[in-house]
Each structure stands twice: as C-alpha cells, then as structure tokens.
C-alpha cells in the first residue's frame, strides 16, 4: 500500500477517535479515559470512582475524592516505607514502657515462650536483643566476648552498622565496639572498634551458636553493654528475660502511626526520606509537632494501615525481587535485600518492605556468599502444587542427606498472621540437626507438619493450627559449597491424604 493510499485511512481513524471524545474506551481497559490532546470534560469513570469535570474543572465532590485518594495512597506507601523503623520502635516501646529496663540494658531470650514476640526468631539458639538511644547514652560500648556468636548492630532503618561475632571483624575472638551518634566529633579512643551510627537509635542482636545450652548461657552472661562515659565503673548487666507478652514487629492500626510519629521525632531525617515525610505531613504526622489527627485523617490512617499491611503481605508473598532458588521449586531466598538497601539508581523500597514485614534485622553475615561463614535463609509458603500451606492439612518435607551446614541446620515454622514462631499446644516450632530426629537409612530426614502427629514420627513432627496459614525458614549456619553450587537440593512440601 502506498503512502498516498494510507492518507484517507489515517483521516478516517482520526475522525473515529474524535467522535469518542473524552469517553473513548482504550482496548480492554474498564475505564473511560480522555484521549491524548482531548480536554477533561464531563463524567469520567476511573479506578478511584466517577470524576466529573465542567470546563475542565473538577466538581467539588470529585475534588474531595481526588485529594482523599492522594492522601490515602501516600499513606499506604508511607506504611511500606515505615515498616523497618516502626518495628524497631515497637521493641523499644516495650523495653522502655513495659519491661522498664535501664537504658542500654538488653533482653535475654532462650525458650519458645520468650521468643514468641519476635518476628521469625530462630527457635534453636539463645539471643540477646535490645535497643539503645544514643542521644541519651552518648557513645556506647558493646563488649563482645570470645566465642561462637553471630550478630549485628543495625541502625533504626535496619541497615547494618557492623556484624559482630564470627562473621564480624572480631571473627569470634572478642572485641570492644564503640558506637557513636550521628555526627560525633569526639576523639576515637584506642582499644575500640569505633563505628558511627547514621541514626540516633540502634539495635543490638546476637545469637549464641554454642550447641551446649550451658555453654551458650555462659556466653550470654559474658556480654557487656554500657555507655562509654561509664567505662571506669560500668553498671552490672542484668539482661532480664521478657516478663510479659510483647511484639517485635510493626504494630497494627493506629498504633503503627503513633510509633512512627514518635520515633521520627527522635530521629534524623535523611535526604532520601524527605518526600515520604511530605506524604505523612498531609495526614497529620510532622516532625516537631504533636500527632493529633482530625476525624478525617484518623479514618484515612486506619484504612491506610489496613491496606498498607495488605500490600505488605502481597508484596512479601510475591517476592518479586527473587526467583526460586532451584528451578521448579517453591523455595526462595528469604532475604532478597541488599543490606545497604542501596542500588545504583534507587533505594530498595519494595525489597525492604518484603523482608521486614516478615522479619527483623539485616547484616552482611545473613546474606553470605562465602562457604563456612555466616548464614543463609530459604523460605517456602506453598506445597509442591503451589497451594498455600494450611494449618488444617498435613504435609511431609523430605530433607536430602547431608544438609549443607557446618554448624547446624533448622526448619522453623511461623504463623503467617503474626510472622512469629507458631504457638501450638506441642510447644515446639522447629526441627534441627541439634535435635534427636529420626534419620532414614540413607541419611535423609522426613519431617512432618499438621494438626496431629503421624504414628511413630512424633520426633520429626511440628503441630500446625487449623485456621492458620504458616510457612517455614530453612536455615543453614556456616553453609557449605553444596548450598552455593546447588548440588544439594531439598524437596517441596507434599500434602498427605
């Protein structure tokens, strides 16, 4: 067809397009949208409802709807953005107001009940966890003893400031770390590993890797944490155990915004976060001002907290940042986030929300690529047919012989609603190589999950709860080459009849 013959066809196409005017329908899109270069006029059906324009001006009702949606969508994105700092702030709320521990004092956890408040806690190892307000303490000392420990110091956006223990610069040989507040100008004393925090508040978390519980408890007692100004006579660390129910994760409903407002007023605003602060300003959350939302703002924030969490759930389950670890498998790397959260041209907003909705903390040691060092985490939420794991159904997981871990491996079960260790009547939430599991003749293991134990397999069973979704982390501590080259592979969950 020649160019001359195309011209009448082009005129006909333009004429048909003009007849559609502002209400022309595009493909399979369910909404009528203005065509390019056509004015906004009349009634237009959109994703946020019907909008009306007169002389291109939105009607009063449309104006209110547009601004409400603008504020609402900004709040849902601020929810995803605020998850990491809201989680740490919530732990700090409990330590300061419920447990009333001294500033700089940490919590000690060992049993399942003591760990039930922590997002995706390791069920196998004891912990020391807590937060420190550097504005209150000034430079802060963490005296790490010699021994098998693994942990980190994170800022309040859950970015690692340093690893400590076997994967840290002390390499398990012990060291004194001195953490300074942002912009600290004081002298750096000798004998300390000095690190500056980008935030006024920090998190400290350490797990004891000793297999013997007595040795692990002894190692816990050797940690010392205190303000540098008290170094001549540091107070004795008590490291109390949690004395009440708590939640180390982002709270629900208005409590999320209350925690977020409170911590943002005690923190430095980074350049990368200024636009999110602008979104929060629309709904009554401002640095330097009290949080007194209007009835309209409160209703909007309540809805945004619910939808924001729904987005976090979907974003987490989709795990768009990672692919199946083995082709055709329902196992993915749980931590698909760079610990720095920074890529060449963007910061990892979705990836950060994906991990920190279901878990807490990051460190270089948690994303190790070095055999024999650190740890790795694989997550599975579905059976081999792609159906979500259901607490009312029973499953088998076949663990191939010689799991690739120098220290130990474990499979821990978590409630999908709370993202914490499953709180079952059995009072067991994990299986690991440190337990007396039934081993098959070829060295493999068959693990079982469901409301009731299969006869003769009780040692290898974790009880699930009908009405609750659940998922697992497969952890390898000091993973071996067989993990990294993928020569070792685990099966998917098989639903039992």
How should these model regions be labeled?
Residues 23-497:
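A compositional/structural signature for long, glycine/proline-rich flexible linkers
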Residues 20:
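Predominantly soluble domains enriched in secretory-pathway, periplasmic, or organellar proteins
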Residues 1, 13, 23:
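Alpha-helical and His/Cys-centered functional microenvironments
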Residues 1-8:
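Bacterial N-terminal signal peptides that target proteins for export
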Residues 8-17:
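Bacterial N-terminal signal peptides
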């Amino acid at each position: 067809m020649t160019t001359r013959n195309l011209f009448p066809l082009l005129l006909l196409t333009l004429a048909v397009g003009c007849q559609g005017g502002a209400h022309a329908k595009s493909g399979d899109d369910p909404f009528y949208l203005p065509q390019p270069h056509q004015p906004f006029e009349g009634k237009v059906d959109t994703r946020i409802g019907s909008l009306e324009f007169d002389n291109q001006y939105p009607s009063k009702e449309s104006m209110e709807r547009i601004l409400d949606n603008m504020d609402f969508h900004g709040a849902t994105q601020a929810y995803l953005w605020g998850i990491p700092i809201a989680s740490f702030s919530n732990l700090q709320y409990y330590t300061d107001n419920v447990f009333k521990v001294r500033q700089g004092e940490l919590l000690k956890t060992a049993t399942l009940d003591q760990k039930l408040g922590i997002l995706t806690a390791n069920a196998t190892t004891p912990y020391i966890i807590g937060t420190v307000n550097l504005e209150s303490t000034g430079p802060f000392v963490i005296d790490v003893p010699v021994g098998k420990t693994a942990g980190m110091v994170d800022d309040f956006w859950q970015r690692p400031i340093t690893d400590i223990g076997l994967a840290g610069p002390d390499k398990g040989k012990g060291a004194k770390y001195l953490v300074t507040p942002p912009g600290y100008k004081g002298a750096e004393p000798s004998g300390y590993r000095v690190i500056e925090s980008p935030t006024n508040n920090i998190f400290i978390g350490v797990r004891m890797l000793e297999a013997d519980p007595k040795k692990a408890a002894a190692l816990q007692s050797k940690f010392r944490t205190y303000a540098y100004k008290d170094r001549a006579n540091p107070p004795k660390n008590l490291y109390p155990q949690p004395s009440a129910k708590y939640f180390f994760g982002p709270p629900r409903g208005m409590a999320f915004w209350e925690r977020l407002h409170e911590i943002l007023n005690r923190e430095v605003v980074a350049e990368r976060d200024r636009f999110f602060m602008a979104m929060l300003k629309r709904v009554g959350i401002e640095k330097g001002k009290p949080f007194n939302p209007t009835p309209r703002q409160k209703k909007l924030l309540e809805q945004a907290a619910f939808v924001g969490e729904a987005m976090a759930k979907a974003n987490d389950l989709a795990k768009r940042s990672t692919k199946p670890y083995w082709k055709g498998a329902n196992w993915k790397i749980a931590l698909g986030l760079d610990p720095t959260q920074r890529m060449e041209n963007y910061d990892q907003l979705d990836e950060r929300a994906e991990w920190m909705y279901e878990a807490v903390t990051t460190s270089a040691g948690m994303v190790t690529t070095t055999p024999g060092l650190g740890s790795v985490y694989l997550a599975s939420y579905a059976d081999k047919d792609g159906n979500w794991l259901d607490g009312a159904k029973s499953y088998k997981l076949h663990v191939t012989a010689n799991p690739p871990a120098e220290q130990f491996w474990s499979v821990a079960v978590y409630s999908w609603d709370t993202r914490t260790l499953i709180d079952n009547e059995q009072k067991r939430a994990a299986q690991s190589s440190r337990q007396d599991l039934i081993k098959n003749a070829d060295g493999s293991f068959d693990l079982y999950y469901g409301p009731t134990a299969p006869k003769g397999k009780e040692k290898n069973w974790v009880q699930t709860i009908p009405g609750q979704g659940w998922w697992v982390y497969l952890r390898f501590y000091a993973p071996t080459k067989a993990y990294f080259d993928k020569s070792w592979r685990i099966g998917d969950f098989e639903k039992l009849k």
